[in-house]
């Protein structure tokens, strides 16, 4: 199964959602080697730091994409659904209630499922 984790909520400054997301990544690198993980970032320096801190750099089932749009971007509302489809993502996990509104239509067969925590 391919799971996408939206880590764009990890900002350079310490935040609650960012800490929560970092810990999810850290634990998944230790606990799950069966599923494939695609982790989304929008900041290269944050990506490098988190990749090292969580151990994802040594996990073969983790890959990262640095997007050119942030979580509050209007263009991201349109671009992210295409990325999820192109990457054949089964589950999209957002650690915040803000999700791309076009990415999860109910009537599309084989659609990506969404989890919000």
Language-model regions, residue ranges each:
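Carbohydrate transferase catalytic cores enriched for Leloir-type hexosyltransferases
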Residues: 1-117
């Amino acid at each position: 199964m391919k799971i996408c984790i939206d880590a764009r909520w990890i900002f350079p400054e310490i935040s609650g959602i960012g800490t929560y997301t970092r810990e999810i990544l850290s634990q998944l690198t230790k606990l799950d080697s069966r599923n494939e993980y695609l982790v989304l970032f929008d900041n290269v320096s944050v990506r490098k730091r988190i990749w090292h801190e969580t151990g994802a750099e040594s996990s073969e089932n983790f890959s990262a994409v640095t997007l050119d749009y942030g979580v509050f971007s209007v263009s991201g509302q349109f671009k992210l659904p295409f990325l999820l489809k192109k990457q054949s993502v089964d589950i999209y996990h957002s650690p915040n209630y803000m999700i791309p509104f076009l990415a999860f239509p109910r009537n599309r067969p084989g659609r990506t499922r969404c989890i919000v925590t």
